[in-house]
A protein has these predicted regions:
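C-terminal membrane-cytosol helix-exit motif in multi-pass small-molecule transporters
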Residues: 10, 35-54, 237-245
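Helix-loop junctions at membrane interfaces in 12-TM secondary transporters
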Residues: 153-165
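Structural signature of the two symmetry-related core transmembrane helices
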Residues: 136-151, 231
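Loop-to-transmembrane helix entry/capping segments in MFS-fold secondary transporters
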Residues: 104-105, 189-199
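Short amphipathic helix-loop junctions that connect adjacent transmembrane helices
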Residues: 90-107
């Protein structure tokens, strides 16, 4: 939700420029505000006290019996992250500007609504997972989202493109809570900390590589290529994930999500 508000605030320089305030000064102030927000987050985290381990809880342990499963998941999640990095929000904003001439203020408003849809979709994810399962939630909400991204790349005008992108936002993040729960469900309790880090680090590294490729495709004039490539790679990831793990049993305690 706050990411959505931050996107909306991206239009402030244009709004302040209309009031006679220098646009460049406003942009510089926003960078300072971004740094101040980061410092505030650090202060808040540093004030959190470490909680003692609960009695009877499994002590964290390195990956053991679940190592092979976690390695396969990490490889698949890395493909997903690499695909997502091809069209990060900054590149998507650039695409909207280059393709349709969308202003900074309008782009901020779009990302605000897209962020709200993404946030609410994550709240709906547990309900969907209770009905169809964690793996099916990850796969069968992600594939339509990727198709909407491809359709946006081929859209004939701005309104169709924004409509497809908003539809994508309503589905694309629904797999996030389901993915975390699924990883925890296929490993032993003692391995959960190691599994979380082992799947997160490769995802971050993969996501760091692809924005430069997406930017290079934009610079070469292939404006739709990063969106289409992202959508196709994500669909390939979803199909590979479903094929590899649809028969894999999961911890029933994890999959029985709280119905309250």
């Amino acid at each position: 939700l706050f990411a959505a508000l931050g996107a909306l605030a991206a239009g402030l320089p244009d709004a302040l420029a209309a009031l006679g305030i220098d646009r460049l000064a406003s942009l510089r102030a926003m960078f300072v505000g971004y740094a101040a927000a980061g410092a505030s987050i650090w202060i808040l985290y540093s004030g959190i006290e470490r909680q003692p381990a609960q009695e009877g809880a499994a002590a964290p342990a390195p990956l053991g019996p679940s190592r092979a499963i976690v390695i396969r998941l990490a490889a698949l999640f890395s493909l997903d992250s690499f695909a997502g990095g091809l069209i990060v929000n900054s590149l998507l904003a650039l695409w909207l500007f280059e393709r349709f001439g969308l202003s900074l203020t309008a782009a901020g408003a779009f990302f605000f609504w897209a962020g709200l849809l993404s946030a609410f979709s994550q709240l709906l994810a547990p309900r969907v997972a209770r009905r169809i399962g964690l793996l099916n939630t990850m796969v069968f909400t992600h594939i339509p989202a990727s198709l909407f991204l491809i359709l946006a790349a081929l859209a004939p005008d701005l309104w169709w493109a924004l409509g497809f992108l908003l539809a994508r936002s309503a589905l694309s993040q629904m797999d996030v809570p389901a993915r975390s729960a699924y990883v925890m469900s296929v490993v032993t309790p003692a391995e959960r900390t190691a599994a979380a880090s082992f799947t997160a680090v490769p995802r971050s590294l993969a996501a760091a590589l692809s924005p430069s490729l997406g930017g290079a495709l934009f610079a070469a004039g292939w404006l739709a290529a990063p969106l289409v490539a992202c959508g196709c790679l994500k669909i390939a990831y979803d199909l590979a994930l479903w094929q590899a793990f649809r028969q894999h049993p999961v911890d029933e305690v994890i999959t029985k999500l709280d119905s309250r």
